[in-house]
Amino acid sequence: MFHLKRPNRFETDWRSLNRIDHDDYARSGYDRGHNAPNYAMSRLNGRAGQADSFLMTNISPQRPNFNQKFWQRLEEVEITFFAPNFGKVWVITGPIFGQNSQRLSTSWRVEVPTAFYKIYVTEPTPTRPMAALAFVVPQTVKGKEPLTQFVTRIKDVEAQTGLNFLVDLDDKTETDLEGTIDVASWQLNAVNKTLPRYR
């Protein structure tokens, strides 16, 4: 699919209570960081997907080194390596807030996460069982760290977020996937030191 031109502004989501605006982030020192990436959403769902990716409800405040380096690397790996190698890959992602997290200096309505998580889950095939891989990445990263440095268990993501993942799976599969770190199945070492696009 052709690449769609990137919009100049993010749009307020009328469905949200706080109605966060593009300008709430102006001069805050934080990027408007995508949770679901524009590249993947526009590639899979065209203009409608891109429009959804530029809603402010898909945005979290991210430090530049986090957003433009480490997170960009991980997003690129998921679309250019995980998806082609493992077929359909489910991605669960979001912010993690600390006990004493701050708010943007430019808008009290926007809380700043201390870290972000990503969980990848493959669908099983006749030759390959379901696999899962989880990351928790602090905002303080410099950007070029090995991806494996931040691999964790899904159960640890649950402990930090208070969320319960993979609830539709049978109990044994859920327990196995959530309690295991499985780097080998994902061939993560092949892309472990992928360089950021923005250096």
Language-model features, listed with the residues they occupy:
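Domain-level detector of nuclease and nuclease-like folds
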Residues: 14-199
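Glycine/proline-rich, flexible active-site/cofactor-binding loop segments
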Residues: 1-20
